[in-house]
UniProtKB/Swiss-Prot annotation:
Protein S19 forms a complex with S13 that binds strongly to the 16S ribosomal RNA. GO terms for molecular function: rRNA binding; structural constituent of ribosome. GO terms for cellular component: cytoplasm; small ribosomal subunit. Keywords: Ribonucleoprotein, Ribosomal protein, RNA-binding, rRNA-binding. The keyword rRNA-binding applies. The keyword rRNA-binding applies. PANTHER family: RIBOSOMAL PROTEIN S19P FAMILY MEMBER, SMALL RIBOSOMAL SUBUNIT PROTEIN US19M. It comes from the Bacteria. Signal peptide: none annotated. It holds the Pfam family Ribosomal_S19. It comes from Campylobacter concisus (strain 13826). This is Small ribosomal subunit protein uS19. One of its GO terms (biological process) is translation.
Amino acid sequence: MARSLKKGPFVDDHVMKKVIAAKNANDNKPIKTWSRRSTIVPEMIGLTFNVHNGKSFIPVYVTENHIGYKLGEFAPTRTFKGHKGSVQKKIGK
């Protein structure tokens, strides 16, 4: 179910404070965050976020196309190494 329009997008307060501080200071340093649930809003355009994926921080540069998505959508948490298959099948192809 989608979020109600009258509520507006969800952004953690501590992330928004860091965004405002970075915009006011014209700071290009990445903003380190564990808040994967925060929605990307227009104030974040041009900033780089280091989003935690459970193991390390993934740099995410925010552009206009990212608005409305969550920060966590750009930092995958699972690695797919392929389905297990026998060596003979791979050699035969």
